[in-house]
A protein has these predicted regions:
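Accessory DNA-binding and partner-docking regions appended to nucleic-acid-acting proteins
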Residues: 1-128
Length: 128
């Protein structure tokens, strides 16, 4: 018998991102989800700047994202779809994921504040 896994806020943000993409008719790989959550703007992600989770996890890395996505697939919140042409896995939210998403969103306060990436000055010219 499979144990239940209770999602955390980061899992909620990942599920919300994938749900948003699925509603628009898109599916994303782990790299695509990471690009949206960390706020990378390029030709693939510029149309998703209005996504509620765009740029909310700026310090997340690829290893953590893959781990979280695999865990969500294991517990049935996401479905993994293999694309033979691109030789990559893409993710789609399941019915269980949709129910959990609506329940978690209505019972928990989640901050979807966008984080600005302002690089700090690390080298300055020495004054006279």
């Amino acid at each position: 018998m499979q144990k239940n896994y209770f999602i955390n806020v980061t899992d909620y943000k990942v599920l919300l991102t994938i749900s948003y993409l699925n509603e628009l008719g898109y599916i994303a790989s782990a790299q695509g989800v990471l690009k949206i959550l960390s706020g990378v703007i390029d030709e693939e992600t510029e149309m998703f700047e209005l996504c509620p989770t765009f740029q909310v996890l700026v310090s997340y890395n690829s290893k953590k994202m893959t781990r979280d996505l695999n865990r969500l697939v294991t517990y049935g919140y996401l479905k993994r779809i293999h694309n033979e042409e691109l030789k990559d896995y893409f993710f789609e939210i399941t019915e269980k994921g949709k129910v959990t998403l609506s329940y978690f969103g209505s019972h928990h306060k989640v901050n979807l504040k966008k984080h600005d990436i302002n690089p700090r000055v690390t080298i300055i010219k020495k004054g006279k």
